[in-house]
Amino acid sequence: MKTLLYWGWSSLAGLILFSILAHGEMKTFNESNGTNANVLMVGLTLVQAAAAKGAVCLDGSVPGYHLCRGYGSGANNWIIQLQGGAWCDSIQNCQSRKGSGYGSSTLMEKELAFLGLLSNKAAENPDFYNWNKVKVRYCDGASFDGDSENKAAQLQYRGKRIFLAVMEDLMEKGMRQAKQALLSGCSSGGLSAILRCDDFNNLFPPTTTVKCMSDAGFFLDAVDVSGGHSLRRMYSGVVNTQGLQNTLPPTCTSHIKPFLCFFPQYIINQVKTPLFILNSGFDSWQIGNSLAPPSADKSGSWHNCSFSFRCTASQMHFLEGFKMSMLDALKTFSKFSKNGVLITSGWAHCQAERQDTWFPGYSGAGKAKGIAVAVGDWYFERTKQNSS
């Protein structure tokens, strides 16, 4: 099967609704409690047994997830969606994060809306609607990759243990019998899906079809508008604060600085499990937090472009360069037949849990079918065609 490589999908343009918290911590509209009675709301399950394994949130509380059971032909198939929410890059920021659901399960919403990839309606999610669907809550601040602690600051950096403890709990609830499984994630959860992809695959026997998808998790090692590297500074803080040099892939850390191994472009070619990269070439989070954050945009000349997509010609030229750099960073990865790539042209960040981008529901001649079709074609190997 050839790689599904899309160079743009402009009809999926749409501004994602989000609010920026500390250091770009993001909560999308589809994680709210919502008001639409037709939206599937799924309750929170806490993994009490995780405490004995040291698999705890920043504040020491146990981790949690939301599970919607599959049925019919999907009863033995599983989707695991890792929640996003940026990172904490210093002791102070991690302590602040403890005061939210991104650092403590005691403060997590008790229900979340399941939309897009997590929808249980065939009309909204044709390939995966009847699968078992899980959303794993993010409360460690380092993309489920830490395994250390700071006793003096009363901080637990146990993301990797959380991932394994939740997976063990789900195995006991039937995932062990999975015939097909997909590990996915949004934003920093999309980065997690890359980092934990092979670990996830190793949980299953060879007879289980296991693949992974990163949605808006391809954070590029890019130069910002001032000529600096804003995201490098943030990632260096995350890696040093949580000691990720001990947990990031040694195939990467053995030859470049450990914090660079938090950038997907330096590790994706070593992922053995089939992996799908879904990202916007005009990623709204990266534009506002990596390319033109306030620290790099002292004059504020990028504000309208970053947050309202009202960009000048020169700014669009800069952003086109960013998109081309993203495509270039994926060239080698896309040559592996097991992998898939979909780079859209929408002004967005996280598209698999948005119904209007995941599966809009129209497929007439010349009209977009939605991301769901591309992901389904890749996962089930239904097509060999490339699209441009």
UniProtKB/Swiss-Prot annotation:
Chain segments annotated as coiled-coil in the UniProt record: none
Signal peptide location: 1-24
Active-site positions on this chain: 187 (charge relay system), 283 (charge relay system), 349 (charge relay system)
Pfam family, one: PAE
GO function term, MF aspect, one: hydrolase activity
Keyword Manganese: no
Annotated glycosylation sites: 30, 33, 304
GO BP annotation list: cell wall organization
Protein name per the record: Pectin acetylesterase 1
Species for this entry: Arabidopsis thaliana
